[in-house]
């Protein structure tokens, strides 16, 4: 079979985000999103995956305090998706990558258990 580009997207919408900034550069477009539910940011990791309006994208930078993250779109992604008509202030659907969510939740449960054992 052929290689899967990106990650498996299930179509679940975990939250929405607002496009808070866009900047065109010579070869791509940087888009910054502000999450509606900021606690979701713990699942969005630099160089990790996130689905934005069903499109699998690689995360650039994450600002946990502000609940924002950015992606870089190449011209082909802009051309082939709805990103060609998205503007600052617009809303998008966000799907968290399932294995990242499972890993973060597992580590949190483990750390909580260890803390309880310590304070026991």
Where are these regions (language model features)?
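Conserved loop->alpha-helix
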Residues: 1-120
